[in-house]
From Swiss-Prot:
Region listing for Disordered, in residue ranges: 163-191
InterPro entries: NAC-dom, NAC_dom_sf
Name of the protein: NAC domain-containing protein JA2L
Other notes: Plants silencing JA2L exhibit enhanced susceptibility to the fungal pathogen Botrytis cinerea.
Transcription keyword on record: yes
Amino acid sequence: MGVQEMDPLTQLSLPPGFRFYPTDEELLVQYLCRKVAGHDFSLQIIAEIDLYKFDPWVLPSKAIFGEKEWYFFSPRDRKYPNGSRPNRVAGSGYWKATGTDKVITTDGRKVGIKKALVFYIGKAPKGTKTNWIMHEYRLSEPTTKTGSSRLDDWVLCRIYKKNSGGQKSSCSDLQNKDISHASSSSSSSQFDDMLESLPAIEDRYFSLPRVNSIRNFQQNDKINLQQLSSGNFDWAAMAGLNSFPELRTGNQVPTPGNQTPVLINTNQYHNHNDNLNNFNEFFANSTALNFHGEVKFEGGVDQEVESSVRAQRLNSVNPGFFQENSTGFSSSYTNSVPDPFGIRYPTQTVNMGFTG
């Protein structure tokens, strides 16, 4: 079943570099049509044999020219005397059609049909498939008379042996790997380019006054909680008094009109080891405290905030904001505590759980 190698250049005394690779249209128009019409060729490059009398591996030795593909003019016989089916039995096996027929046209006109066949060793339908392939070209119009044993006087056949499945699959795997690597690299490069093309996020969208005030409020709450755990308490900050520049230690708050100013005396609070026995005493006048302030925010956006804080008379029963009980530490809040955030603390006894 081996193929006998022959030097095509010495077969026809052809010049170096000569190759015979005709198209489907050229095979039908320039060769088969001329052969059926009885025209002679100046160069006989396609042999005339009864192809169905030989096994395919013998055909290369019958060819006039070819290295890996061999061309033949061959007649086709009828399988049945009055039938239209061709006889596909050849040598030790048979040719079996595969795929669909391809219509060949020239100048928009149908000129012939191309059919693909595979050779099987043995008898149909239990033959063994081989790698030998045939492309059969026939004209659209029948070339024989009715009643003849010949189905076609001449058809043109191309014979070749395809590569084994192992070699084909290995080449296919290499191509798939290259394609996959190239596609992944291309996708990664496109993703990087897309990220670089995105505009930078401007910081001014994150520096708005409302956002900053919420962020500062959260940070202040976190600091106050940390101070509770460490034993250092700044009750003025917790009550929201230190958020106003006028209400600082030892300062006199300016008041409009003839109102009596509020004096705030803040002492250093004792640490946790002293059991928090000494507390600040806050004295407030009986008149209301009106405070008007204007706050400007950075970030390119100015927002004017007008707040009015009115301090009411403190509970005469409890002169101080805070009072120690038997548990070691407790606090009583009143609704009179001014708060810049508009939050009023309910009047109830809160046990912090600190003991001496």
